[in-house]
Curated annotation (Swiss-Prot):
All residue ranges annotated as the Chitin-binding type R&R domain in the record: 32-102
Species for this entry: Drosophila melanogaster
Keyword list, A-Z: Cuticle, Signal
Functional summary from the UniProt entry: Component of the cuticle of the larva.
GO MF assignments: structural constituent of chitin-based larval cuticle
Signal peptide region: 1-18
GO BP terms in the entry: chitin-based cuticle development; larval chitin-based cuticle development
Identification of the protein by name: Larval cuticle protein 65Ab1
InterPro entries: Cuticle_Struct_Prot (IPR050468), Insect_cuticle (IPR000618)
Pfam (any one): Chitin_bind_4
Length: 104
C-alpha cells in the first residue's frame, strides 16, 4: 500500500512539472560598433534586437537599441508583443496592451 501511495505521488509530481521552453533558433552578430540578436523558443517567446554605437569615441557616445519581444500567456493563449527603442532618451516601449499617457 505504501508503495502505491509513493508511486502515485511521484507520478503526480512528474505530470505536474511545467514544460520548459527550449531554444529553437538563435542568431547573433556582434561587431565593434553594431550588434544584432534573434532568439525564438519552443513556447512562442521571441526576442529580436539591433543596436548601434552612436558617436563612437566621443564624449557623446551612446548605444541605440531597437527591438521587440513577444510571449504567449499560458492560461489564455493571448500573444503579447512589445517593441522598443532604448537610447540617450531612455527606454521607450510600445505595445497594444500597454496604457498610453494622455496628450497634454
Amino acid at each position: 500500500m505504501k508503495f502505491l501511495i509513493v508511486f502515485v505521488a511521484l507520478f503526480a509530481m512528474a505530470v505536474a512539472r511545467p514544460n520548459l521552453a527550449e531554444i529553437v533558433r538563435q542568431v547573433s552578430d556582434v561587431e565593434p560598433e553594431k550588434w544584432s540578436s534573434d532568439v525564438e523558443t519552443s513556447d512562442g517567446t521571441s526576442i529580436k534586437q539591433e543596436g548601434v554605437l552612436k558617436n563612437a569615441g566621443t564624449d557623446n557616445e551612446a548605444a541605440v537599441v531597437h527591438g521587440s519581444f513577444t510571449w504567449v500567456d499560458e492560461k489564455t493563449g493571448e500573444k503579447f508583443t512589445i517593441t522598443y527603442v532604448a537610447d540617450e532618451n531612455g527606454y521607450q516601449p510600445q505595445g497594444a496592451h500597454l496604457p498610453v499617457a494622455p496628450v497634454a
